[in-house]
Amino acid sequence: MTVQTPPRARRRRSGRFAPYVYLAPAMTLFALFLALPIGYALYLSFRTVKVSGLGLGKGARTEVWAGFDNYARSLTDPDFIDSVIRVALYGLVLVPVMLGLALLFALLLDSKRTRGRGFSRVSIFLPYAVPAVIASLLWGFLYLPRVSPFYYVFDKIGWDAPDILSSQWVLFAIANIGLWGGVGFNMIVIYTALKAIPSELYEAARLDGATEVQIAWRIKIPVVTPSLILTFLFSMIATLQVFAEPMTLRPLTNTISSTWSPLMKVYRDAFTRDDIYSAAATSVIIALATFALSFGFLRLVQRRAFSQENS
Amino acid sequence: MRLHTGIRAAAIIAATTLLAAGCTSGDDTTSSSPTGGSTEKAEKVDLTFWTWAPGMDDVVKAWNDANPDIQVTVNKQDGGDPAVTKLLTAIKAGSGAPDLMQTEYQKIPTLVAADALADISGAVDSSIAGHFADGTWQSVTLGGDAVYGIPQDSGPMEFYYREDIFTKYKLDVPTTWAEYADVATKLHEADPKAYLGTFSATDAGWFTGLTQQAGASWWGINGDAWSVDIDSAASQKVASYWGDLVEKGVIDNKPMYTPEWNAALNDGTQAGWVSAIWAPGVLAGNAADTQGKWKMAPMPQWNAGDNATGNWGGSATSVTSQSKNVEAATKFATWMNTSQDAVNILVAKGGLYPADLPGQAEALSAPPAFFPNQPDFYTTATDIAKSVQPFTYGPNVNVAFSAYNDQFGKAAESKKASAFLTALTAMQKATVDDLLNSGFTVDE
Amino acid sequence: MTATLAPTKPPTVVRTTTGATGPSNKRSTLSTVVLLVGAAYCLLPVAWVLVASTKSAGELFTTFTFTPSTHLWDNVQDLSAYRGGLFWRWMANTALYAGVGALLSVIVSAMAGFGLAKFSFAGKKAIFNVILAGVLVPGVVLAIPQYLLLAQVGLTNTYWSVLLPSIISPYGIYLARIYAAASVPDDVLEAARTDGAGEARIFARIAVPMMVPGLVTVFLFQFVAIWNNYMLPYIMLGNDRLFPITVGLSGLLNQGASQPAMYTAVITGALLSIIPLIALFLLLQRYWQVDLAAGAVKA
């Protein structure tokens, strides 16, 4: 993609079109590979297939309008409602722990009093490089009592550890994989914000005798609050879309159903039941709910932490 | 499936731009020669074949070497359910499907219902039906005149056990399910860590085979209507039997095919496995060190003296409805599954139990390498294979199987025999609801 | 959803009245230990893959988890021999999808981010918000419609079918906008325009060099995103010679009931596939700065 160099005389006028030229590739790709498929999915969410007779042979299936049937079925499906509640719980467990640890690690990295910072920074960020499917496979091995080193140690010290994949604990097992993969990235985000704080700001406080904890609490954390809010927002969206971890762990246990998370239900409908229509309807519901939550959350925090940009 | 003109136009513009950028696309799925019939004999035909069975590269190589005019390319796929979705999506889109596809027997009605498979009855030799057992042949014809594939292998079920452990604890090989329960109890008492087997809620095909042995047939065709009989007396008998064993704790309740299960096969704490004829391959891969310690026996029976078994696994080779070379594809599929040369390779390299009856004798002359201690392995197996009970699959096996995973997962976790019956009822309901919702006529 | 956010001014320093002037550079054992525990937690599964990939198939399930063995080389050779070296082809494909895809994504995102940050024009806010809304739609849902649309133009089962949809990244555009706003001063652009430089020149010679650190982050971000994406290549590709590593390895794991899962191959493959990524991360270490919010101050 080349941007035409406008002749000097027309420079001012061309300035008006320049932003559109810059945006053209992104908008074209967006339209073709996101907007169009989304629109198509939206269309499919109002369709369904009807079968005649035994449904065998040519022409036995026809696609017809379904109105809001797919939506109504999704919203009244107890499996779907359960999955939403489950994922809400999952988010409540995962997001605060993940961001809390990310903040803690970032603060420790930022403190000159901590040793081994370079090594720790690399190590904690490392899991980000591991695809979720592979991460879940690795943790799966570490969760299964017979092949896990943890259970081996528990056994040796005579502690009867509960099965982490049993129904009471499986949520934590999945959240742990999310935590493992996500804490490093969020740590880097917060650490970047911390590094941007001019050091004079807290050197003065330090000279006045403020402790590291006081400096962190009163100066550093307020400054990184906008980053925290955005990491919270992105983590929330990722939580609602949790999929790869429970999906990969599922064959290892009885306790993860095929509709464990809302997106798994979408997957089951589209890929196991070959019902792309209700899968599309469910995903529209998920997208709208994500939108409402994100928007509501931003509204809530905007007054506190941000000033509205006027452009 | 047609899209709106606007959408298509936009997509075409995008594609043209991109192609103009000059990148070569990947291998085309199907041959470029659309000609059918006799003229194609002179031209070279390229066929693509989606499969996940082992040894396919070897058998295809043998074919390609002998048939320069019909070249087959193996594209190995993920063996899970999504492979079917992938094919169905390609069918909906009107392009992208391979010429040949490995089709598990239980998926054939679903694929036929989606018009994904070509009827090759016009391209096959009429004598071909004689190569297969009636039940096997019926699963590719669905009882009609059409032919939707050439059977490749089948999976008659047997009981596998660790001979050394049975000797150690002085256990007798169970011939009935009542004896199986006794042996399971004795073994678990003798070694509280050991189990004679596990109830696997992730393997719907396994449970289906068990109910098949007990006389169940989950679907049926009644004129123009489907019937669903998952929650039948026969299935209930099987469900409550296993539920009872799980509740007593003498049988494990964890899924098969996990690293945990592999470890148990290795250390002997899974001392038995109700499985199918292809088990030697799985055992060899998962617990190579136990070679020669296992033995195979007929399934325990519901009534002493009976002789019945079910099927777990097995698939056919089908030609898809998008193939432009149905005749060539059929020719290959027929050769692969009914010629002695190909069947020998399938057994030797793939460890399959061939569906082709005439080819069995030669191909199965030696026992599997993993069972050197049982020279008559295949002689016994061939007898057992004759006792597979009839069973009909319906057009929404995927729905029933996914309901099995969820419902029996809950039941196995609860360790309550009553929950196993509840699970069966829930499965029946989910399957019928899905059929009704799609507009099928269901005979209730 | 809007991301036109700007943080408030940093709060004024709270002066404490404690008299003691604490020694600020004293090492703290507690914080070191906490951080090292965190590092150990993150390294543990990686260490596990390392050890597990040295084991033969039998040892994997029979020996203690962290007892290393000597079969790493055998495992690598077995994996390399699998179907005529298909594994390495998957690695090369992954490098192509993630590398080229991320590079194109950076170019597209940088242009869009620059345009959004440095110009005011009709529909700017709407365009930005619409692009960001793309984050809300999960990829699992889009794979099938994307397939059906690409099939209309015959692009399924080609490199394009995976590459093209991977180029557009709402996150990338969001980040690029922030970096452009934060790192490219308006007066520099104005000066260049006064000197008669064309837009292409301004972008390529002035804006991009200033944005480089941020763009490297976008590259890493998108590289990992494409690397991680399983559903799109899974549904798009029928030809196993076009598969990326994730789809290929998952096929080795899901072999159907009558086949043992190839755990040793998958674990060795996982190890080999993580190594280049780790190398890339270490190489670009100094660019790890994901500034989600700060840049918006000047926007």
Task: Tell me what each language-model feature is.
Chain B
Residues 184-186, 225-255, 299:
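Glycine-centered hinge/linker elements that transmit conformational signals in sensory
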Residues 1-46, 65, 432-444:
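Short, low-complexity disordered leader/linker segments with a strong preference
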Residues 89, 97-99, 127-165, 306-310, ...:
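A structural signal for short loop-to-beta-strand junctions that line the ligand-binding cleft
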Residues 167, 384-444:
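Conserved C-terminal helix/tail region of periplasmic/extracytoplasmic solute-binding proteins
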Residues 65-132, 167-175, 264, 268-272, ...:
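Extracytoplasmic "Venus flytrap"/periplasmic binding protein-like
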Residues 278-290, 303-406, 442-444:
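C-terminal lobe and pocket-closing loops
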Residues 146-152, 157, 178-228, 234, ...:
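Extracytoplasmic/periplasmic solute-binding protein
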Residues 105-157, 210-212, 295-297, 444:
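Hinge/lid segment of periplasmic solute-binding proteins
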